[in-house]
Amino acid sequence: GDNYPPKNMYIKLIRNKPKGNAITGRLIVDDGQLTLDTLEPWQYAIPAGCYRLRLTYSPAFQEILPILDGVLGYARQPHNGIRRTGIRIHAGNTIADSRGCILVGSIDMGDKARLLSSRKALNELREYLLNYQKEYPNEEIYIEITEPDAYPLYDVPYECQLQKP
């Protein structure tokens, strides 16, 4: 089809500096078509870097959820030296709801370590990604995670493109 040049989708997760044990951030999907707030637990957070994102069924959550695939981390090793696997994006309100997974929602302005409307945010994200996959079945989705002190932000995550599987 007229599906060229390849329309790989890029998602950016721009992390803020950790406050206590919480890392907040912004998830910018497809050049800002969708933006969501994120929350991660610092001690389990995966390294900054570039990952392929897939949508698979999660037996634990009993729903289709994004999963980060292919650990192409740089700039920072996992805190405990353990390679993180099974990292998903899912709903939740505080870091107690995550063992390294990325929670999405809207930051509670009264309590920055808390997400509101998380289920709604997850549904929006999943719907956007599923529609994209339907429209571009042969393309990949990449997520680049950046940190303020770890790596410069690029408009186009060049590492992602270099390391295509």
Where would I find each of the regions flagged by the language model?
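Transmembrane helix recognition focused on a "late"/terminal membrane span
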Residues: 154-155, 163
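Cell wall/extracellular polymer interaction/catalysis modules
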Residues: 4-141, 147-152, 158
